[in-house]
């Protein structure tokens, strides 16, 4: 996982792979982390899309960074606020 990447493959606890499209990535200085918001590509156009979020650490070579779960309610609040701002900006365009 790296900033600017468009698709990522998520592997669940059972080893199932799911191709997802990256909505956007951002860094947050308060938490000192990079974050990625993404959604499953297989979602139907008429279905409500579930947007997922993870923190990530890019590898030194810039490829295949590791995703981590969001750990605190404060992080979730910050991510939700960032997403709402992003979606509001998209609606204005």
From Swiss-Prot:
InterPro entries noted in UniProt: UPF0473
Pfam families documented for this protein: DUF1292
Coiled-coil ranges per UniProt: none
HAMAP family membership: UPF0473
Family membership: Belongs to the UPF0473 family.
Protein name, entry field: UPF0473 protein YrzB
Organism: Bacillus subtilis (strain 168)
């Amino acid at each position: 996982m790296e900033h600017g990447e468009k698709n990522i493959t998520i592997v669940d606890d059972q080893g199932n792979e799911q191709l997802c499209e990256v909505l956007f990535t951002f860094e947050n200085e308060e938490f000192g982390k990079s974050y990625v918001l993404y959604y499953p590509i297989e979602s139907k156009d008429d279905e409500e899309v579930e947007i997922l979020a993870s923190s990530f650490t890019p590898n030194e070579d810039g490829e295949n960074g590791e995703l981590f779960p969001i750990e605190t309610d404060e992080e979730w609040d910050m991510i939700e606020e960032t997403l709402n701002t992003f979606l509001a900006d998209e609606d204005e365009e």
